[in-house]
Swiss-Prot record:
GO MF term list: rRNA binding; structural constituent of ribosome
Gene: rplC
InterPro entries registered for this protein in UniProt: Ribosomal_uL3, Ribosomal_uL3_bac/org-type, Ribosomal_uL3_CS, Transl_B-barrel_sf
Reported function: One of the primary rRNA binding proteins, it binds directly near the 3'-end of the 23S rRNA, where it nucleates assembly of the 50S subunit.
SUPFAM superfamilies membership: Translation proteins
Lineage: Bacteria, Pseudomonadati, Chlorobiota, Chlorobiia, Chlorobiales
Organism: Chlorobium limicola (strain DSM 245 / NBRC 103803 / 6330)
Record-linked NCBIfam families: L3_bact
Keywords for the protein's UniProt record, in alphabetical order: Ribonucleoprotein, Ribosomal protein, RNA-binding, rRNA-binding
GO process annotations (BP): translation
Keyword Glycoprotein: no
Domain of life: Bacteria
One GO cellular component, as annotated: cytosolic large ribosomal subunit
Protein name: Large ribosomal subunit protein uL3
Annotated family: Belongs to the universal ribosomal protein uL3 family.
């Protein structure tokens, strides 16, 4: 049981004992360190703040330099918080967090930000069918149709599906299986797809039994 931060490297495939191809995502989960321990007495809640990667100290501002220095760790690229209950052991600031806290075959949830698609119409964003392709139609092919009545109700209802910014949402993909663990290179190979583009950061959390 554990939790860790990771960087999405890309997708590949592995073959199981039956010679079946399995689509997998490779995640660089480390080096990770505890940068802060939060407690209910001081902060109002219990959590571990985890940082990932090693970054040049000159490329971060002074407050963040002090924050990393206090923990006694090298500055990282990103930090995220995890509940203490997601770890099977007590950690202190500066302790490493390794992929060895997971096991092959274990099920995890992966949290990330989905790919941003920019401003999208209703056909792409909500899978609308669009207008009829015949009977004199000239410019209604990908139009949304009516979005509110005339005199009644004289307004557009809140939540009506319309064109707008698509993607860039917080997504959790559940029950993904860890196919392979490579501790020497801090790699996790997870069955299936995880949210976000290449080189984006994700949170990997064990499923509580």
């Amino acid at each position: 049981m554990g939790a860790i931060l990771g960087k999405k490297i890309g997708m590949t495939r592995l073959y199981n004992d039956k010679r079946e191809a399995i689509s997998c995502t490779v995640i660089q989960a480390g080096p990770c360190f505890v940068t802060q321990v939060k407690s209910a007495e001081k902060d109002g809640y219990d959590a571990y703040q985890i940082g990932i990667g090693e970054r040049d100290e000159k490329k971060i501002n002074k407050p963040m330099q002090g924050h990393y220095r206090k923990a006694g760790v090298t500055p990282g690229f990103m930090m995220a918080e995890f509940k203490k209950t997601e770890f099977s052991e007590n950690l202190e600031a500066g302790n490493p967090v390794s992929v060895e806290s997971f096991k092959e075959g274990e099920k995890v949830n992966v949290l990330g930000v989905s790919k941003g698609k920019g401003f999208a119409g209703v056909v792409k964003r909500h899978n609308f069918g669009g207008g009829s392709r015949t009977h004199g139609q000239s410019d209604r092919l990908r139009a949304p149709g009516s979005v509110g009545g005339s005199s009644d109700p004289s307004r557009t209802f809140r939540g009506t599906r319309m064109a707008g910014r698509m993607g860039g949402d917080n997504i959790t993909v559940k029950n993904l299986e860890i196919v392979k663990i490579m501790p020497e290179s801090n790699l996790l190979v997870i069955k299936g797809a995880v949210p976000g583009p290449k080189n984006s950061y994700v949170k990997i959390v064990s499923i509580k039994k």
